[in-house]
């Protein structure tokens, strides 16, 4: 080795191993708080081990992965990192529960140009809080410090979740039929979808979202409100009634694109848009961006985070169980029969908005 050339280290290349190890130490307690009895061992192994919970006759594993889209850009711009982890968990676990699955464990991937231990620990603490709300274990993850791939301390997130459902109790929409009722659960705001449009509206309007107030709250807080996690109330509904025929997590694509994913070929969802008061944040976005009404429902959830299909005769019981679980449900529409070329989702009373 030439004595004239300085000795290079990984740190010189932009990767701080000590920072990575410091992060792991800080988040071990977060993972421990989420632990389920089926999880074997703590953080730090090469792989995470988890038993199938007792009591299942024919357990089927259900998996999902997701991110939080460009809501992350807004979080970075606002330097607000405490709830984006809950968004990440919600996007994954809500997709599992619509199959009837109980989430078991969750892993995250955090990639950054330069690791800021405080920011990363804040994000992972939010992931842990989301896992607690969903009843699943945070069993591991990957923190990748990749200089030259991301600008400064910018970071990207992905989440991965595995759940379990009894084979005979999988909810797949196959029993949906004309006359069934559709029940909605409210969202907390835009959740984690439509943020490229939202950011464009903010840019075009020139609004200072920290200063704009809607219903007495800063617009920035309304836009960063964490995605709701519906797992526990929905699992209670399934267990107590056995009445759930289908569920749709209202994400990117809104009501128009997500409900058809769980409908049989001849079924059409007829939605009464006048059945709920759209939160003010959506009205502000529509007004500032001059967004077409149908486009609003195709991009944003417009105040609806989850739609549940039950027989009309089970609707009142379902509403009762959901209210007892702390939800504020309402009947948003019904199922009708339709032809092959018909619209799969019909939005009535659009003019009322």
UniProtKB/Swiss-Prot annotation:
GO terms for biological process: 'de novo' IMP biosynthetic process; adenine biosynthetic process; purine nucleotide biosynthetic process. The keyword Phosphoprotein does not apply. Keywords: ATP-binding, Cytoplasm, Ligase, Nucleotide-binding, Purine biosynthesis. It is found in: Cytoplasm. SUPFAM superfamilies: PurM C-terminal domain-like, PurM N-terminal domain-like. The keyword Protein biosynthesis does not apply. Its EC number is 6.3.3.1. Transmembrane segments: none annotated. It catalyses: 2-formamido-N(1)-(5-O-phospho-beta-D-ribosyl)acetamidine + ATP = 5-amino-1-(5-phospho-beta-D-ribosyl)imidazole + ADP + phosphate + H(+). Pathway: Purine metabolism; IMP biosynthesis via de novo pathway; 5-amino-1-(5-phospho-D-ribosyl)imidazole from N(2)-formyl-N(1)-(5-phospho-D-ribosyl)glycinamide: step 2/2. It holds the Pfam family AIRS. GO terms for cellular component: cytosol. It comes from the Bacteria. GO terms for molecular function: ATP binding; phosphoribosylamine-glycine ligase activity; phosphoribosylformylglycinamidine cyclo-ligase activity. Its main location: cytoplasm. PANTHER family: TRIFUNCTIONAL PURINE BIOSYNTHETIC PROTEIN ADENOSINE-3, TRIFUNCTIONAL PURINE BIOSYNTHETIC PROTEIN ADENOSINE-3-RELATED. Belongs to the AIR synthase family. This is Phosphoribosylformylglycinamidine cyclo-ligase. The lineage of its organism: Bacteria, Pseudomonadati, Pseudomonadota, Gammaproteobacteria, Pseudomonadales. The gene is purM.
């Amino acid at each position: 080795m030439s004595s004239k050339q300085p000795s290079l280290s990984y740190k010189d290349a932009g990767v701080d191993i000590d920072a990575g190890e410091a992060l792991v130490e800080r988040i071990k307690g977060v993972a421990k708080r989420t632990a389920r009895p089926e999880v074997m061992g703590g953080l730090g192994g090469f792989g995470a081990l988890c038993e199938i919970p007792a009591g299942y006759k024919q357990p089927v594993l259900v998996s999902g992965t997701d991110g939080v889209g460009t809501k992350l850009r807004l979080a970075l711009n606002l330097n607000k990192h405490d709830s984006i982890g809950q968004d990440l968990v919600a996007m994954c676990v809500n997709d599992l529960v619509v199959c009837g699955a109980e989430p078991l464990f969750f892993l995250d991937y955090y990639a950054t140009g330069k690791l800021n231990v405080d920011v990363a620990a804040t994000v992972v603490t939010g992931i842990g809080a989301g896992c607690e709300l969903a009843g699943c274990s945070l069993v591991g993850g990957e923190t990748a410090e990749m200089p030259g791939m991301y600008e400064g301390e910018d970071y990207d997130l992905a989440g991965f979740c595995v759940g379990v459902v009894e084979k005979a109790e999988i909810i797949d929409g196959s029993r949906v039929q004309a006359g069934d009722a559709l029940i909605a659960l409210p969202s907390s705001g835009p959740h984690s979808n439509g943020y490229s449009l939202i950011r464009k509206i903010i840019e075009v309007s020139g609004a200072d979202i920290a200063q704009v107030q809607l219903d007495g709250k800063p617009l920035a807080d309304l836009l960063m409100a964490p995605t709701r996690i519906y797992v526990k109330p929905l699992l209670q509904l399934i267990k107590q009634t056995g009445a759930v025929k289908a569920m749709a997590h209202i994400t990117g694509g809104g009501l128009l694109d997500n409900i058809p994913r769980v409908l049989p070929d001849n079924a059409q969802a007829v939605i009464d848009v006048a059945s709920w008061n759209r939160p003010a944040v959506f009205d502000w976005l529509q007004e500032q961006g001059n967004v077409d009404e149908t486009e609003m429902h195709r991009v944003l959830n417009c105040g609806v985070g989850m739609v549940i299909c039950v027989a009309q005769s089970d609707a009142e019981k379902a509403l009762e169980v959901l209210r007892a679980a702390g939800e504020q449900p309402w009947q948003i529409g019904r199922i009708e029969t339709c032809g092959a070329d018909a619209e799969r989702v019909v939005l009535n009373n659009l003019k009322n908005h």
